[in-house]
Swiss-Prot record:
Keywords: Chromatin regulator, Growth regulation, Metal-binding, Nucleus, Transcription, Transcription regulation, Zinc, Zinc-finger
Residue ranges, compositional bias (Basic residues): 136-152
Region (Disordered): 128-203, 286-320
Species of provenance: Gallus gallus (Chicken)
Entry-linked SUPFAM superfamilies: FYVE/PHD zinc finger (SSF57903)
Record remark on domains: The PHD-type zinc finger mediates the binding to H3K4me3.
Protein name as it appears in the record: Inhibitor of growth protein 3
């Protein structure tokens, strides 16, 4: 799991490279602007003195002005080329980041199926600001903005700590404590239940956040996986919201399209917690659907009876999760109220999806990746093509036209004959 360290090492020089190129671009921009101002002044002087001088002088001045204009145009083109190089540099690093994220998610899924969904859902929950609960009816009319800047005195000293940071620290402390107590199976139930309750009692409106990653696997590598998950949550919590949610949207789209289902691959230690995979899958499905902003009315279902039973089992599981205070009571309630959910195929894998708003290119209608070649036909509807899709292994010499434009040019040539 060295993807993060490798990527950070790769982009270590990126800020300095961008700064140097932006500085160079700014210098070229000023150079072009100064040249245009001088040329404008020379043109005005030329027209003012044109009638007083000989035709030879006018021709000489006109040639000199045109030459300087072409020089300014070349500088402007060079500035545009530099901007394109900067864009390609950043885009290449973004694609590399997407690839490393996909590898990291697959490595986590190989050890614990479904762990990335829980981590990403918790990250979104940390991003979502929750309104502070005010128990006094006398202050119920106070606006939310005012309560944020003027906290009540009855909340104590913890009001000075941001809620998002507090919940992140509580989550990380729970994960690390579960990982350290993995080797004591006799006290696993008590430790997991007590740490879970202590960590998430601060937010009673989210009872489903009290899952224990320490109980995800009972194998010898469970402690390492839990520690890796804790580090992943910590790194994700420290990222900016824009960059963090970009990769999460793809996972939620895959989950909503039934490309990914939690089944028996979600290996829980049944000897310690007694959770059933179907109960946890139904609970996660209900939680994900309730947090999504998309409407359920537009979704198509193949079997209405199965979907209704799943929704009822999810609601009952959610109510039991919020009412139980210990893991043993939670396991007993879930075992009595859950229904059977169709399990996903064990060989199914999560397909890495790109941003749906990213433009598509080439005859394969896919996003930009790898080496691409541009069609020299200005009216080409596709414009950019992958090397492999058009049978290229290196950059073509001279002008290059795509197969569609080549066929169209041949048809036009045959008509003229």
């Amino acid at each position: 799991m060295l993807y993060l360290e490798d990527y950070l090492e790769m982009i270590e020089q990126l800020p300095m490279d961008l700064r140097d190129r932006f500085t160079e671009m700014r210098e070229m921009d000023l150079q072009v602007q100064n040249a245009m101002d001088q040329l404008e002044q020379r043109v005005n002087e030329f027209f003012m003195n044109a009638k007083k001088n000989k035709p030879e002088w006018r021709e000489e001045q006109m040639t000199s002005i045109k030459k300087d204009y072409y020089k300014a145009l070349e500088d402007a083109d060079e500035k545009v080329q530099l901007a394109n190089q900067i864009y390609d540099l950043v885009d290449r690093h973004l694609r590399k980041l997407d690839q490393e994220l996909a590898k990291f998610k697959m490595e986590l899924e190989a050890d614990n199926a479904g762990i990335t969904e829980i981590l990403e859902r918790r990250s979104l929950e940390l991003d979502t600001p929750s309104q502070p609960v005010n128990n006094h009816h006398a202050h119920s009319h106070t606006p939310v903005e005012k309560r944020k800047h003027n906290p009540s005195s009855h909340h104590g000293a913890t009001d000075h700590v941001p809620e998002k940071k507090f919940k992140s620290e509580a989550l990380l402390s729970t994960l690390t404590s579960d990982a350290s107590k993995e080797n004591t199976p006799g006290r696993r139930n008590n430790n997991s239940s007590s740490s879970s309750n202590n960590a998430y009692n601060t937010n009673s409106s989210q009872p489903l956040a009290s899952y224990n990653l320490g109980s995800l696997s009972s194998g010898s590598g469970a402690g390492a996986i839990t520690m890796a998950a804790a580090q992943a949550v910590q790194a994700t919590a420290q990222m900016k919201e824009g960059r963090r949610t970009s990769s999460l949207k793809a996972s939620y789209e895959a989950f909503k399209n039934n490309d990914f289902q939690l089944g028996r691959e979600f290996s829980l230690s049944r000897d310690s917690t007694g959770y059933s995979s179907s109960a946890l899958a139904s609970t996660l499905t209900q939680t994900l659907s309730s947090s999504s902003t998309d409407s359920r009315s537009g979704r198509k279902s193949k079997n209405n009876n199965k979907s209704s039973s799943q929704q009822s089992s999810s609601s009952s599981s959610s109510s039991s999760l919020s009412s139980c205070s210990s893991s043993s009571a939670l396991a007993q309630e879930l075992s009595q109220q859950t229904a059977v959910i169709p399990e996903s195929d064990s060989n199914s894998q999560v397909d890495w999806t790109y941003d749906p708003n990213e433009p598509r290119y080439c005859i394969c209608n896919q996003v930009s990746y790898g080496e691409m070649v541009g069609c020299d036909n200005q009216d080409c509807p596709i414009e950019w093509f992958h090397y492999g899709c058009v049978g290229l292994t290196e950059a073509p010499k001279g002008k290059w036209y795509c197969p569609q434009c080549t066929a169209a040019m041949k048809r036009r040539g045959s008509r003229h004959k």
